[in-house]
UniProtKB/Swiss-Prot annotation:
It comes from Bacillus cereus (strain ATCC 14579 / DSM 31 / CCUG 7414 / JCM 2152 / NBRC 15305 / NCIMB 9373 / NCTC 2599 / NRRL B-3711). The modification N6-(pyridoxal phosphate)lysine is found at K239. Pathway: Amino-acid degradation; L-kynurenine degradation; L-alanine and anthranilate from L-kynurenine: step 1/1; Cofactor biosynthesis; NAD(+) biosynthesis; quinolinate from L-kynurenine: step 2/3. This is Kynureninase. It comes from the Bacteria.
């Protein structure tokens, strides 16, 4: 259990760390001495188990050559399916509904190509104006491939406050001309969690297929897709799942849709026992593996093996419990220590609506992020005025949160941020 009630003292932070049930996992990760890493919502840290699994697959290449496809501890030919089964509990899906493949964007193209079937008056895709740009680019592209104009056929739900979305507004936008819906599970700026169960129920009442981009939720919050009856989902594995930069992504398709041919078919869409028959007629796999396209990127998949072992040991419910407590602690500390420095908290305060990161707004956000980095705290900046801070349950401590807020207070009090330009770097 985590210590209550909140106190702003250093001793309280240490006491919370003492009671942290997950504290032993911190030694699993490579943490740079003198640095407080609060950017795990953008790129998770390397774990020793992820490193080991990568080296294991390199060794299998060295040892077996071409036979690595069927030999060794993790035969490559079945690796995507194996990791899909290990990922399934994190989203509350059946093992056969989940596959590790592609990138987030290519997987969006896959699910949209599969589920977007404009007919009659149902020709539009519903998204939102706060979603990640890549999702919009892919949706626009898929609409154009149908010979339609994205300006007419892509509907984006407006935000009332520029930070969050109203679920009532989303439901109101589910009109008779909507053919498909793609929404974020957690908004990448504000960290707002959308009620996926409610939105799925409302979409299905209207005969609309609905899916979610889980990039900012998977590995951070529990999901219950089998209960919620979500149609499809996509995600990356390099944020909270700590599988490394450019790691292979994930895709979920509800088993009730396994009769659908993939919109984008390829070499690995095939049933395994038929693949090397080399026929020109595809016999698609009868599980989520059908929605793969090309050969698995084995070395970019490898770190996920070790990372998912950690998640199995830690448990997503325990991770969520700590995440809620440590983010609430950080919000309380920010409110206590930074009230004189014109910060606005941009994420929901309610536990059930808040994901795994804190979102602060400030007119000097870009230069504040640079000053934090210069002081050994790693945040990230999101245009136009956002500072994201992610105390990750697996490897961040309450002491680190306390120190980072004190450093931020010092930066503001001494105006250290003024020595930096208030514009983002090439990579924010």
């Amino acid at each position: 259990m985590y210590k209550e009630p909140f106190q702003p003292t250093y001793e309280y932070a240490l006491e919370c760390d003492k009671h942290d049930e997950l504290k032993d996992f911190q030694t699993e990760f490579y943490k740079k001495e003198g640095t407080i890493y609060l950017d795990g919502n953008s790129l998770g840290l390397l774990s020793k188990r992820a490193e080991k699994s990568l080296l294991t697959l390199l060794d299998s290449w060295k040892e077996y050559g071409i036979d690595g496809w069927t030999e060794g501890e993790h035969p490559w030919f079945f690796l995507s399916e194996k990791l899909g089964k290990l990922t399934a509990p994190l989203i509350g899906a059946l093992p056969e509904e989940t596959i590790v493949t592609g990138s987030t964007t290519t997987n969006i193209h896959q699910v949209i190509a599969t589920f977007y079937e404009p007919k009659g008056i149902r020709t539009k895709i519903l998204a939102d104006e706060l979603t990640f740009p890549s999702d919009i680019y892919a949706l626009q592209s898929q609409i154009r491939l149908k010979g339609l104009d994205p300006e007419e056929h892509l509907v984006r739900v407006k935000s009332r406050d520029g930070r969050t979305l109203s679920e009532e507004d989303i439901i109101h936008a589910m009109e008779d001309d909507i053919a498909l819906i793609l929404l974020p599970s957690v908004l990448y700026r504000s960290g707002q969690i959308l009620d996926m169960k409610r939105l799925t129920t409302e979409a299905h009442k209207r005969g609309i297929h609905i899916g979610f981009d889980l990039c900012h939720s998977i590995g951070s919050i529990p999901h219950h897709f089998k209960d919620w009856d979500v149609d499809f989902a996509v995600w990356c594995n390099y944020k909270y799942l700590n599988a490394g930069p450019g790691s292979v992504a994930g895709l979920y398709v509800n088993s009730k849709h396994f009769n659908r041919l993939p919109g984008l078919s390829g070499w690995f869409s095939s049933r395994k026992d038929k693949q090397f028959d080399m026929e020109h007629t595809l016999t698609a796999a009868d599980h989520a593996g059908a929605y793969q396209i090309g050969t698995p990127h084995v070395l970019s998949t490898a770190p996920l093996i070790g990372s998912l072992e950690i998640f199995k040991d830690a448990g997503i419910e325990r991770l969520r419990e700590k995440s809620l407590h440590i983010t609430r602690y950080m919000l309380n500390l920010i409110g206590h220590e930074l009230k004189d420095f014109e910060f606005t908290i941009g994420n929901p305060l309610e536990d059930e609506k808040r994901g795994g990161h804190i979102y602060l707004e400030h007119a000097e956000a870009a230069r504040i992020c640079k000053a934090l980095k210069a002081n050994g705290v790693i945040p990230d900046f999101r245009a136009p005025n956002g500072v994201r801070l992610a105390p990750v349950a697996l490897y961040n401590t309450y002491e680190e949160v306390w120190k980072s807020v004190q450093i931020l207070k010092k930066i503001m009090k001494n105006e250290e941020y003024k020595q930096f330009e208030n514009k983002r770097e090439v990579v924010a």
